[in-house]
Amino acid sequence: MERDFSGSPRVIADLGRIIDRLEALGRLVRVRSEVDPRHDLAGIAARFEGGPQAVLFEKVAGHAYPVFVGLYWSRELLGALFDQPETALPQHVAASIKSWQSAPVDPLVVADGPVLEVTEAEVDLSTLPIPIHALEDGGPYFDAAVVIAKDPETGVRNASIQRFQVIGKDRLVINIDAGRHLGLYLDKAAARGEPLAFTLNVGVGPGVHFAAAAPAEAAPVETDELGIASAFHGAPLELVAGTVGPVEMVAHAMWALECEIRPGEVHAEGPFAEVTGYYARVEPRPLVRVKRIHRRRAPIFHTLLSGAEVFNSVGLLGEANVLALLRVQVPGVEDVYFSHGGCGFYHCVVKIAQKRAGWAKQAILATFAAFPPLKMVTVVDEDVDIRNGRDVEWAMTTRLDAKTGILVIENAFGHGLNPTFPNYLGTKVGFDCTRPFPHTPAFDRAKTKAMTLDGLDIVGAKR
């Protein structure tokens, strides 16, 4: 007997319904010509990157399933999906995480789900339309799939997003960022002489992605991060039990792969064009064995481009965490923004209405502590538009005292994908671009009267 899933769950929890919603809003482009998943698909997608529409490739050469890209490359698009102004997204995300922290809603394990509609008789990753994006990438990559694993000692679930290179019909290689809970789980399993089982969930909603991207500072190791997805959905996230392993799968995913990593098994991985705009180097990394593949009857493969899509997924979670912590620790903080020029999580601009001298530097230190991948923090006054690079540069050139306003922190932990942080250690810098406190008229911005052009007789104007 088949279960009817047509009325469940909320739109935000189901990728198929998300795509339908985007199309209804006029925010979906359909590419109906056949496209080669090796380089061509990414090259076409890049022409739309950062725009207000996502892209669905209906015909992928050599494959039976479509590919979707662009869910996260525009905050305007994300805002439309969440019914939020794009500038309010960090506050919306922060509020959802705070709701989870104060009243956690555990995921619900159900008996069945769309992801179990088909279980492949044979494990063959070549049947999935996994693209090769950049010209020098080492092969096809899963780059938008969510890993669910369990602590071998406590059984607590963890969600994360890692990159996986396909190297065979049933083999992958995983890159695990340093400091991630998944790496801790792998070490614990190896110490016990056991494989680490996990599931790889493809085509999930933003709530699950945001749960997976939540910084460790927001979701400590003893908590089940998947509850964050429940907070975004407004209802418990539905999971289904694994069929060959002990780890659950997202019930409404498009695909779910049951996998394991055995102690000591490694394989060369890379290169891969990362969010920094550089290729991650080839290194030996953990080998993954795929034990079983489940999918919907008509699945859609979700991929993302390493760029704006990472800025607006991982970066948005970073913004939300920094904003929530700064508002508690530093009086006067009004807003934060992770700039796209800073790869979405290396440069944070903080807006503050200073109440006391020295609080801008306090904000710099607190921001670095709230999100360790950051390399640079710039603090500006409340009269500066933090999302306007020209305005931030204006504050830097006219308000920064280069002798007293630059804070340099050497040998600090950072992000391994940033080439200036080899082995995760490097130098961080903070810029106090605020007016001297107490304020004087010398640093007041010149203003003109706010006027409307409505009703005026104007000829030849172009706006």
From Swiss-Prot:
Alphabetized PANTHER family for the sequence: 3-OCTAPRENYL-4-HYDROXYBENZOATE CARBOXY-LYASE-RELATED, 4-HYDROXYBENZOATE DECARBOXYLASE
Q: Pfam families annotated for this entry? A: UbiD, UbiD_C, UbiD_N
**Record-level GO cellular component terms:** cytoplasm
Q: What species was this sequence derived from?
A: Rhodospirillum rubrum
Give the family per the record. Answer: Belongs to the UbiD family.
The record's annotation in InterPro entries points to: UbiD (IPR002830), UbiD-like_C (IPR049381), UbiD-like_N (IPR049383), UbiD_Rift_dom (IPR048304)
In terms of NCBIfam families, this protein maps to: UbiD family decarboxylase
Report which superkingdom the organism of origin falls in: Bacteria
Protein's name according to its UniProt entry: Uncharacterized protein in cooM 5'region
**Could you cite one Gene Ontology molecular function of this protein?**
carboxy-lyase activity
